[in-house]
From Swiss-Prot:
One GO term describing the cellular component: cytoplasm
Subcellular location field: Cytoplasm
Name of this protein: ATP phosphoribosyltransferase
Name of the coding gene: hisG
Role this protein plays: Catalyzes the condensation of ATP and 5-phosphoribose 1-diphosphate to form N'-(5'-phosphoribosyl)-ATP (PR-ATP). Has a crucial role in the pathway because the rate of histidine biosynthesis seems to be controlled primarily by regulation of HisG enzymatic activity.
SUPFAM superfamilies in alphabetical order: Periplasmic binding protein-like II (SSF53850)
EC category: transferase
InterPro entries assigned to the protein according to its UniProt record, in alphabetical order: ATP_PRibTrfase_cat, ATP_PRibTrfase_CS, ATP_PRibTrfase_HisG, ATP_PRibTrfase_HisG_short
Cited HAMAP family: HisG_Short (MF_01018)
A Pfam family of this chain: HisG
Organism: Halalkalibacterium halodurans (strain ATCC BAA-125 / DSM 18197 / FERM 7344 / JCM 9153 / C-125) (Bacillus halodurans)
Keywords annotated in UniProt: Amino-acid biosynthesis, ATP-binding, Cytoplasm, Glycosyltransferase, Histidine biosynthesis, Nucleotide-binding, Transferase
Length: 212
């Protein structure tokens, strides 16, 4: 039986995804979360885990170095990679929002600029809204942009809204709810269909059970 390679995003999603896999009966070592290795083999399950930046997970899966992966819907929409999205894991729920300073008024914004680490997603959203904006790509600390005059608004992930409040920003528009998804390489799905189908079925039972 060939090894199944799983790409996992480092950070909050990783911890929740590992918990989900354990609930689904996968025997993952207790020190798994504390490991600083980027590649972790689990011989008991004949699985290999690749720990990557969230934005890179779909790339690893698309190119076949990982058979399956866990990725946020925000990353999927931004990256638009050639992968199958097979299951909504319903973990790490948050939402994408447009935010800005409390006194922001769209009608007075003659040269609208929006900062985001999701330039493609933001561009599509504002186009659908019939609004022409200049998108400025940032890789972090997006909330800084309106405070220093780089942009009037931002598009970013919101979990509790605490970061916005602490930086004096307010939510202007809620764009969409985001959860993490199980994604699969199309070739792997054909070559390792039994193992992948088994994983999907086991995870589905946990997801539906938790949601009951």
């Amino acid at each position: 039986m060939s090894m199944l390679t799983v790409a996992m995003p480092k950070g909050r999603i990783f911890d929740e995804a590992v918990g989900l896999l354990r609930k689904a009966g996968y025997n993952l070592p207790a020190e798994f979360e504390a490991s600083r290795k980027l590649i972790v083999d689990v011989p008991e399950e004949n699985m290999r885990f690749i720990l990557a930046k969230p934005m890179d997970v779909p790339t690893y899966v698309e190119h076949g170095v990982a058979d399956v992966g866990v990725a946020g819907k925000d990353v999927m929409l931004e990256e638009e990679r050639d992968v199958y999205e097979v299951l909504d894991l319903k973990i790490s729920e948050c939402y994408l929002a447009v935010a800005g300073l409390p006194n922001y008024e769209k009608k007075h914004d003659l040269n609208p600029k929006v900062a985001s680490k999701y330039p493609h997603l933001a561009t599509r959203y504002f186009k659908e809204q019939g609004e022409q904006v200049e998108i400025i790509k940032l890789n972090g600390s997006i909330e800084l942009a309106p405070l220093i005059g780089l942009a009037d608004r931002i598009v970013d992930i919101v979990s509790t809204g605490r970061t916005l409040r602490e930086n004096g920003l307010v939510e202007l528009e809620k764009m969409m709810t985001i959860t993490s998804r199980l994604i699969v390489n199309p070739v792997s799905y054909r070559m390792k269909d039994e193992r992948i189908d088994e994983m999907v079925e086991r995870l589905l039972q946990v997801v539906e059970g938790d949601g009951a």
